[in-house]
């Protein structure tokens, strides 16, 4: 059953605790007592199966995110925010969690945050945990309630101060303050399953209405919300639930008194419905600049991991080594490249941007790696492509493999020339290949899917039945059509919207999948070009790109007016790049377009080609260091040239100036002659692109470049 660390004698008994708690900051005599030490209740179980079959091998809170266990991020956040005692409640795989914590810095005698581990096979929900908190009288004042898969750098001192002040002034009426972060509905860290719409009192931040939006097309609000408020009501759909709650001791008591409360959402809805009867209120605290998110599915895992690599969770960045682990020593270089100790990178391999290489990892020759995290002691063969790939410890990827937006768990192996389409998952020790393509959404595990049926009664118990399952595995063979001729594993799920279980498929590991039939008539009838769909895949929302483009334009305008140096302009553009989750490719496209458009923004009316060049060329000269910062490789040159071509196809009256513009790019050493010639000679182009290349001035410029190249070759 349960093993519980000794609870300090300072904890009051139940008779004293029922008085409503000391969280309101009461007074004694003439002087106010200082606030008691801050406590936290950390729930190290999700009580759902969103991460199955991954979490069949290890609990969610121990899954590595940027090579650090999720629970370590949560405990670091709690400690940084001033928590001095944390109760960690474990159920599923409790022994693994306990072992991890006991070996970590959190259980060291010098830890500022005393971690007490409480385990039980009987917990089935958050409600069970909080009823146990109440039964054991663990909390003696306001406490933080949080799951062990939350990543945050929020300073909650202001929210805590507001919470305590409210309880003092209103005689403990407010029992909970929920922490939210401002976030647009299209932001990558918005989880569809957790999206909520709130009605909030404009003056007091009291939550009046709380509704999950999953599966809803329309929302309704009680009319009384608006009739009873003197100061106005805000309807908010721009908030991300950080799953951080400041609770009074009454919260645990209310869960005891209401056994139908199983989740925090049950609790919130129950209190709002019965507010007039019980007199309890819930408030919210909103942060705009800090970071907080819960890793509730693989979509959120990917989004939060990307944010850590891009340094949005500072100071929780990979090179900081906040876990004090000898294997977490990283160096950080430009474009967010992180390398652990004893990393080997083969000749011709390119780490493009946002890449983390774990200690002891070996990368072969001519590999391309971008937006990926590779765990310790991995081996990557030659000519491998990794794009948004997440590899855990000891993974092996053979030559010629391609992995796109997929997850490979501990010691998984990908054989030669295997292609993983987006949203694939290989759980621990799975082998696939060689020469196989895994369809999008494939999940391969060493645990047979039919073993699920045998576990329904004991799905939250510990791993006592693991040996029985291993015996079942031995009796069942692997299907080479699913995992390849040398593969080892069973196919759990391949997304197929034609199956009857499409609701379950949409609730896959990667989160809620959009059902196209539910889109509005206008959207569903709109025809979309396949190239447009390709361009959207793996890139931010179009709205974010438009906003980024406007921000870059504003930055350059201000730079020109205030004479800001190019180095500082690069810093500002980089910060915008990370803010809107923009790739380097898109930065080059936007930068090229914005600069070429700049003269048109400054002059009313139509510009002729000569006047346009007169305005543009000085700008190119002034901002050439900005271009050179982003345009380095041949692929970068071609992307910039494609953006230049697109601009002139949009502004056909300016095509006569294209040759002068390209000459300026060439003379300023932004674009190289070989890439300009390569761009001009492209065959797979549109009719308009072919027509553009027939421009006489452009052809003369290309001929001049070719002759210059020949002369250079003769001189050599």
From Swiss-Prot:
Coiled coil residues, start to end: none
Biased composition (Acidic residues): 451-466
Subcellular location: Cytoplasm, Cytosol
Region (Disordered): 1-35, 443-481, 517-539
Annotated positions of the Omega-N-methylarginine modification: 18
Top-level taxon of the source organism: Eukaryota
Sequence position, cross-link Glycyl lysine isopeptide (Lys-Gly) (interchain with G-Cter in ubiquitin): 56, 98, 136, 212, 500
Domain W2 residue range list: 538-715
Post-translational modification: Phosphorylated on serine and threonine residues by GSK3B; phosphorylation inhibits its function. Phosphorylated at Ser-539 by DYRK2; this is required for subsequent phosphorylation by GSK3B. Polyubiquitinated, probably by NEDD4.
SMART domains per the UniProt record, alphabetical: eIF5C
Activity regulation information from UniProt: Activated by the chemical integrated stress response (ISR) inhibitor ISRIB which stimulates guanine nucleotide exchange factor activity for both phosphorylated and unphosphorylated eIF2.
Keywords for this protein: Cytoplasm, Initiation factor, Isopeptide bond, Methylation, Phosphoprotein, Protein biosynthesis, Ubl conjugation
Phosphothreonine carried by residues: 317
PTM-bearing positions, type Phosphoserine: 22, 125, 445, 461, 464, 527, 535, 539, 712
Residue stretches of biased makeup (Gly residues): 18-28
GO-annotated biological processes: astrocyte development; astrocyte differentiation; cytoplasmic translational initiation; hippocampus development; myelination; oligodendrocyte development; ovarian follicle development; positive regulation of apoptotic process
Biased composition range(s): Basic and acidic residues: 523-535
Pfam families: LbH_EIF2B (PF25084), W2 (PF02020)
A cellular component term, taken from the record's GO annotations: nucleus
Cysteine-cysteine disulfides: none
MF terms (GO), sorted A to Z: guanyl-nucleotide exchange factor activity; translation initiation factor activity; translation initiation factor binding
Homology family: Belongs to the eIF-2B gamma/epsilon subunits family.
Function: Acts as a component of the translation initiation factor 2B (eIF2B) complex, which catalyzes the exchange of GDP for GTP on eukaryotic initiation factor 2 (eIF2) gamma subunit. Its guanine nucleotide exchange factor activity is repressed when bound to eIF2 complex phosphorylated on the alpha subunit, thereby limiting the amount of methionyl-initiator methionine tRNA available to the ribosome and consequently global translation is repressed.
Subunit structure: Component of the translation initiation factor 2B (eIF2B) complex which is a heterodecamer of two sets of five different subunits: alpha, beta, gamma, delta and epsilon. Subunits alpha, beta and delta comprise a regulatory subcomplex and subunits epsilon and gamma comprise a catalytic subcomplex. Within the complex, the hexameric regulatory complex resides at the center, with the two heterodimeric catalytic subcomplexes bound on opposite sides.
Protein name, per record: Translation initiation factor eIF2B subunit epsilon
UniProt organism field: Rattus norvegicus
Upper classification of the organism: Eukaryota, Metazoa, Chordata, Craniata, Vertebrata
């Amino acid at each position: 059953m349960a093993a519980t660390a000794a609870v300090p004698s300072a904890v009051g008994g139940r008779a004293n605790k029922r008085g409503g708690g000391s969280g309101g900051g009461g007074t004694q005599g003439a002087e106010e007592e200082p606030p008691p030490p801050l406590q936290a209740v950390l729930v190290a179980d999700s009580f759902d199966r969103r991460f199955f079959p991954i979490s069949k091998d290890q609990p969610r809170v121990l899954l590595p995110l940027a090579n650090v266990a999720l629970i370590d991020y949560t405990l670091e956040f709690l400690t940084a925010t001033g928590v001095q005692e944390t109760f960690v409640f474990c159920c599923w795989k409790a022994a693994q969690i306990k072992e991890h914590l006991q070996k970590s810095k959190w259980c060291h005698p010098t830890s500022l945050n005393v971690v007490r581990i409480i385990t039980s096979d009987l917990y089935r929900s958050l409600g069970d945990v909080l009823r146990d908190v109440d039964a054991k009288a663990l909390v003696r004042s306001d406490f933080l309630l949080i799951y062990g898969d939350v990543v945050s750098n929020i300073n909650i001192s202001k929210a805590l101060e507001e919470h305590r002040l409210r309880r003092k002034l209103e005689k403990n009426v407010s029992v909970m303050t929920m922490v939210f972060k401002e976030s647009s509905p299209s932001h990558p860290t918005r989880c569809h399953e957790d999206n909520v719409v709130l009605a909030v009192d404009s003056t007091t931040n009291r939550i009046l209405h709380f509704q999950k939006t999953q599966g809803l097309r329309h929302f309704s609000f009680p009319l009384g919300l608006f009739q009873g408020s003197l100061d106005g009501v805000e309807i908010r759909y721009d908030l991300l639930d950080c799953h951080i709650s400041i609770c009074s001791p009454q919260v645990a008591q209310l869960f005891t008194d209401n056994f139908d409360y199983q989740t925090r959402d049950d609790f919130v809805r129950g209190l709002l419905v019965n507010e007039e009867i019980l007199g309890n209120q819930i408030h919210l605290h909103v942060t705009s600049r800090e970071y907080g998110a819960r890793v509730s599915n693989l979509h959120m895992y990917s989004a939060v991991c990307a944010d850590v690599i891009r340094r949005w969770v500072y100071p929780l960045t990979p090179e900081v080594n906040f876990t004090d682990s000898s294997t977490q020593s990283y160096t950080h270089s430009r474009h967010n490249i992180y390398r652990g100790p004893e990393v080997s990178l083969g000749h011709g391999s390119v780490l493009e941007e946002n890449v983390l290489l774990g200690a002891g990892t070996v990368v072969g020759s001519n590999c391309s790696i971008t937006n990926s995290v590779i765990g310790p002691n991995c081996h990557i063969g030659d000519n491998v492509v990794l794009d948004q790939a997440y590899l855990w410890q000891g993974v092996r990827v053979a030559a010629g493999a391609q992995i796109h937006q997929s997850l490979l768990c501990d010691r998984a192996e990908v054989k030669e020339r295997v292609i993983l389409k987006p949203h694939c998952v290989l759980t621990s020790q799975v082998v696939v290949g060689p020469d196989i393509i895994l369809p999008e959404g494939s999940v391969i595990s060493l645990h047979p899917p039919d073993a699920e049926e045998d576990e329904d009664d004991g799905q939250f118990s510990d791993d006592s039945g693991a040996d029985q399952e291993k015996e079942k595995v031995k009796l069942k063979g692997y299907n080479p059509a699913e995992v390849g001729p040398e593969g080892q594993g069973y196919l759990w799920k391949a997304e197929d919207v034609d199956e009857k279980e499409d609701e379950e498929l949409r609730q896959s590991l990667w989160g809620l999948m959009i059902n196209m039939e539910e889109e509005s008539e206008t959207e569903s009838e709109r025809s979309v070009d396949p190239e447009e769909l390709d361009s959207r895949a793996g890139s931010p929302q179009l709205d974010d790109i438009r906003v980024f483009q406007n921000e870059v334009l504003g930055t350059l305008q201000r730079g020109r007016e205030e004479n800001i140096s190019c180095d500082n302009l690069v810093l500002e553009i980089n910060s915008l790049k990370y803010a809107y989750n923009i790739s380097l490719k898109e930065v080059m496209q936007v930068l090229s377009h914005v600069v070429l458009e700049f003269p048109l923004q400054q002059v009313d009316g139509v510009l002729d080609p000569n006047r346009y060049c007169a305005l543009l060329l000085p700008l190119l000269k002034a901002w050439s260091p900005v271009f050179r910062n982003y345009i380095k490789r041949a692929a970068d040159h071609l992307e910039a040239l494609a953006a230049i071509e697109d601009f002139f196809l949009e502004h056909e009256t300016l095509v006569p100036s294209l040759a002068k513009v390209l000459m300026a790019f060439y003379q300023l050493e932004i674009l190289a002659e070989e890439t300009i010639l390569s761009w001009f000679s492209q065959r797979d182009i549109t009719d308009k692109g072919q027509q553009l290349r027939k421009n006489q001035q452009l052809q003369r410029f290309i001929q001049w470049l070719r002759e210059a190249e020949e002369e250079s070759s003769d001189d050599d």
